[in-house]
């Protein structure tokens, strides 16, 4: 138990030193940098060309959803590749773990599919039109 606690202590000290190192570098750079804002520095840079239009463009959320799904399955490959290289040494328990891992990701993919996040062209919802009813004034004149 003491050895395990000591190992976690080493990891904690390493993480703490990493955070201190990054925060110290960030704060030092922020204190030492000159602050000279001007319109040229704040303008949009387009590979040396003059910017056309606004840089604030709305992107469709579907791009982000597709990118997130790609990243999820890309990370799955990163996790499954080392498992596949040592499959024979790990035995059947590791196979079951890998199948559960892949199954959870497939369930997430099916959920995204059923929800419609994978449909690139979605049908636009149409608002049903109400049938026109005669106004009370029109119906009163017919009597």
Curated annotation (Swiss-Prot):
Gene Ontology CC, one term: NADH dehydrogenase complex
Membrane topology classification: Multi-pass membrane protein
TM annotation in the entry: 8-28, 63-83, 93-113
Cell compartments where the protein resides: Cell inner membrane
UniProt entry keywords in alphabetical sequence: Cell inner membrane, Cell membrane, Membrane, NAD, Quinone, Translocase, Transmembrane, Transmembrane helix, Transport
Signal peptide as annotated in the record: none
GO molecular function: NADH dehydrogenase (ubiquinone) activity; NADH:ubiquinone reductase (non-electrogenic) activity; quinone binding
UniProt xrefs under InterPro entries: NAD(P)H_OxRDtase_bac/plastid, NADH_UbQ/plastoQ_OxRdtase_su3, NDAH_ubi_oxred_su3_sf
EC number in record: 7.1.1.-
Catalytic activity, as annotated: a quinone + NADH + 5 H(+)(in) = a quinol + NAD(+) + 4 H(+)(out)
Main location: membrane
Complex formation: NDH-1 is composed of 14 different subunits. Subunits NuoA, H, J, K, L, M, N constitute the membrane sector of the complex.
PANTHER family tied to this protein: NADH-UBIQUINONE OXIDOREDUCTASE CHAIN 3
Protein task: NDH-1 shuttles electrons from NADH, via FMN and iron-sulfur (Fe-S) centers, to quinones in the respiratory chain. The immediate electron acceptor for the enzyme in this species is believed to be a menaquinone. Couples the redox reaction to proton translocation (for every two electrons transferred, four hydrogen ions are translocated across the cytoplasmic membrane), and thus conserves the redox energy in a proton gradient.
Membership in a protein family: Belongs to the complex I subunit 3 family.
Name used for this protein in its record: NADH-quinone oxidoreductase subunit A
């Amino acid at each position: 138990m003491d050895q395990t606690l000591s190992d976690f202590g080493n990891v904690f000290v390493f993480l703490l030193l990493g955070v201190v190192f990054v925060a110290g570098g960030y704060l030092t750079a922020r204190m030492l940098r000159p602050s000279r804002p001007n319109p040229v520095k704040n303008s949009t840079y387009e590979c040396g060309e003059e910017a056309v239009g606004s840089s604030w463009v709305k992107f469709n959320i579907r791009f982000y959803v597709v990118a997130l799904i790609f990243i999820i399955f890309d990370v799955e490959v990163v996790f499954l590749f080392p498992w596949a290289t040592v499959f024979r040494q790990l035995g059947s328990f590791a196979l079951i773990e890998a199948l559960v891992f892949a199954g959870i990701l497939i369930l997430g993919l099916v959920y995204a599919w059923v929800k419609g996040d994978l449909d690139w062209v979605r049908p636009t919802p149409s608002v049903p039109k109400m049938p026109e009813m005669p106004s009370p004034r029109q119906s009163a004149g017919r009597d």
